[in-house]
């Protein structure tokens, strides 16, 4: 696979089908759980820690599935979906680096929600700053991330942890 520095929605759907990094390796979830429409920038240098960064986006429209059920009469995107998107991106980063295995979110440090995503919003922007990657018998990515809606930061997460596993039998 040639390392690109940006990915389209079609590229991300190929990743969801297991076609981007190869069989048994990092995959994104399929829609509806795919919470990213495009990756506009990915690099293994730069970012807050100088070890890599990603910028990705999700287009918001009132027809997105979660607005119909969360909450009736008070539609708002569940904050956990923004958190999951950041884990999705850390896993993608590990696969992009050429690491083998299937991705699993392993936790995070502090998570803060200080805003909301309403159906009137236009775009979410995810910023991921890689703190550390381990690529030995254990494949692990640790990152900090933020989510912004229409340019205003609304969520932050420190110490996002994602691992890649060649066997998930012990889970």
Curated annotation (Swiss-Prot):
Alphabetical list of PANTHER family matching this protein: 3-HYDROXYACYL-[ACYL-CARRIER-PROTEIN] DEHYDRATASE, 3-HYDROXYDECANOYL-[ACYL-CARRIER-PROTEIN] DEHYDRATASE
Family: Belongs to the thioester dehydratase family. FabA subfamily.
CDD domains the record matches: FabA
Pathway assignment: Lipid metabolism; fatty acid biosynthesis
Subcellular location: Cytoplasm
GO CC term, one of those recorded: cytoplasm
Superkingdom, taxonomy of origin: Bacteria
Keyword entries, A-Z: Cytoplasm, Fatty acid biosynthesis, Fatty acid metabolism, Isomerase, Lipid biosynthesis, Lipid metabolism, Lyase
Coiled coil regions, renumbered to chain: none
Subunit text: Homodimer.
Record-level GO BP terms: unsaturated fatty acid biosynthetic process
Enzyme Commission code(s) on record: 4.2.1.59, 5.3.3.14
Function of the molecule: Necessary for the introduction of cis unsaturation into fatty acids. Catalyzes the dehydration of (3R)-3-hydroxydecanoyl-ACP to E-(2)-decenoyl-ACP and then its isomerization to Z-(3)-decenoyl-ACP. Can catalyze the dehydratase reaction for beta-hydroxyacyl-ACPs with saturated chain lengths up to 16:0, being most active on intermediate chain length.
Keyword Lyase attributed: yes
Catalyses which reaction(s): a (3R)-hydroxyacyl-[ACP] = a (2E)-enoyl-[ACP] + H2O; (3R)-hydroxydecanoyl-[ACP] = (2E)-decenoyl-[ACP] + H2O; (2E)-decenoyl-[ACP] = (3Z)-decenoyl-[ACP]
Molecular function as annotated in GO: (3R)-hydroxyacyl-[acyl-carrier-protein] dehydratase activity; trans-2-decenoyl-acyl-carrier-protein isomerase activity
Active site (catalytic residues): 70
Name listed for the protein in its UniProt record: 3-hydroxydecanoyl-[acyl-carrier-protein] dehydratase
Gene3D superfamilies for the chain: Hotdog Thioesterase
Species, as recorded: Azotobacter vinelandii (strain DJ / ATCC BAA-1303)
């Amino acid at each position: 696979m040639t390392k690109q520095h940006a990915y389209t929605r079609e590229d991300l759907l190929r990743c969801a089908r297991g076609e981007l990094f190869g069989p048994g390796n990092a995959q994104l979830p399929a829609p509806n759980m795919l919470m990213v429409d495009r990756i506009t920038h990915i690099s293994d240098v730069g970012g807050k820690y100088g070890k890599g960064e990603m910028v990705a986006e999700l287009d918001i429209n009132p027809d997105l599935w979660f607005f119909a059920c969360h909450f009736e009469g008070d539609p708002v995107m569940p904050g956990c979906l923004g958190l999951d998107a950041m884990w999705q991106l850390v896993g993608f980063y590990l696969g992009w680096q050429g690491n083998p295995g299937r991705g699993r979110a392993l936790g995070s440090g502090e998570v803060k929600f200080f805003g909301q995503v309403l159906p009137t919003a236009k775009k979410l922007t995810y910023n991921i700053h890689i703190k550390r990657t381990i690529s030995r018998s254990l494949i692990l990515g640790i990152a900090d991330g933020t989510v912004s809606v229409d340019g205003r930061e609304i969520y932050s997460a420190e110490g996002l942890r994602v691992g890649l596993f060649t066997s998930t039998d012990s889970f």
